[in-house]
Amino acid sequence: MGFKCGIVGLPNVGKSTLFNALTKAGIEAANYPFCTIEPNTGVVPMPDPRLDALAEIVKPERILPTTMEFVDIAGLVAGASKGEGLGNKFLANIRETDAIGHVVRCFENDDIVHVAGKIDPLDDIDTINTELALADLDSCERAIQRLQKRAKGGDKEAKFELSVMEKILPVLENAGMIRSVGLDKEELQAIKSYNFLTLKPTMYIANVNEDGFENNPYLDRVREIAAKEGAVVVPVCAAIESEIAELDDEEKVEFLQDLGIEEPGLNRVIRAGYALLNLQTYFTAGVKEVRAWTVSVGATAPKAAAVIHTDFEKGFIRAEVIAYEDFIQFNGENGAKEAGKWRLEGKDYIVQDGDVMHFRFNV
């Protein structure tokens, strides 16, 4: 289980450059709109130094990180919800993703044209958010018409669903985001099947120049917008990231040291996406493989077992658990057992990030 994050943005904001760096896919990042029409998909390993630390102790035959999927969706333009600039296709592609990474241009460069002729992150964000809201408004209005008929017939579920739709309708009419409405669990469940675009967790990826991480008024503007929406901002320099992506591991370390950076910005993008979707990692560690697995925060041990195989959940008996810190501190399973840090947990155990687990099951 990974997740699918759609990378969106206006044409020429650095979206494909960023995606290429993420996946080393080498898509045509040409300096004109719509050079990405079919979405390009890349599966990216989740950067997690804990895997290497576990492998140092266990000495497995192989190491397998958990992954996530990024989808490069063509540059959206004003009017996309009415089909402008191949808009319908783009919006349908976004609908299939779990989260949105919205790339916003926060740099000046006369060689790279901006579709609106000027750099204004607020305008750029408004343009895309308006298109997403208009697409949702269309879905919402059609749903209301259908639900009214069922509600009149006394359908309780339809009545509740209708009340939620009527709650979000005025927000969408004002080009607002459904995610800022503060719907409760029951309300969210009622409209889940509609896959609303403005309900998807969103991070703003601010594409800056090499020296644009500080004292950058464009970046400050994006942070202000995100704070109002409850969204995350991850500043990166796509140009630097594409250079880093071409280097081997040794050169990468040197290059980052020269720039005074601890890790590639893309690692922050991937981790922010992970957090956005409320995901966490647990590990299995044996001589055959040390492997990372993705589960939702709050998942029980049987649900975590199901990620490996559904049989593990069906026949779940117990989970053997060692906290990651204990596994490292006591140099593996035997040391953790001697220190009393190895434990057996039942089906109600809530998995913690970094747990090293082994499942006992019977099918």
From Swiss-Prot:
GO molecular function terms noted in the UniProt entry: ATP binding; ATP hydrolysis activity; GTP binding; metal ion binding; ribosomal large subunit binding
Bilayer-crossing regions: none
Domain TGS: 278-361
Family named by the database record: Belongs to the TRAFAC class OBG-HflX-like GTPase superfamily. OBG GTPase family. YchF/OLA1 subfamily.
Residue positions binding ATP: N12, V13, G14, K15, S16, T17
Pfam family, one: MMR_HSR1
UniProt-recorded name of the protein: Ribosome-binding ATPase YchF
All copies of domain OBG-type G, residue ranges: 3-256
Any one GO cellular component localisation term in the record: cytoplasm
Keywords annotated in UniProt: ATP-binding, Magnesium, Metal-binding, Nucleotide-binding
Cofactor: Mg(2+)
Gene3D superfamilies attached to this UniProt entry: 3.10.20.30, P-loop containing nucleotide triphosphate hydrolases, TGS-like domain
InterPro entries associated with the record: ATPase_YchF/OLA1 (IPR004396), Beta-grasp_dom_sf (IPR012675), G_OBG (IPR031167), GTP-bd (IPR006073), P-loop_NTPase (IPR027417), TGS (IPR004095), TGS-like (IPR012676), TGS-like_dom_sf (IPR023192)
Domain of life: Bacteria
Role this protein plays: ATPase that binds to both the 70S ribosome and the 50S ribosomal subunit in a nucleotide-independent manner. Does not hydrolyze GTP.
Domains: entry comment: Composed of 3 distinct structural domains: the N-terminal domain, which has a mononucleotide binding fold typical for the P-loop NTPases, followed by a pronounced alpha-helical coiled coil domain and the C-terminal domain, which may be involved in RNA binding.
Residues holding Mg(2+): S16, T36
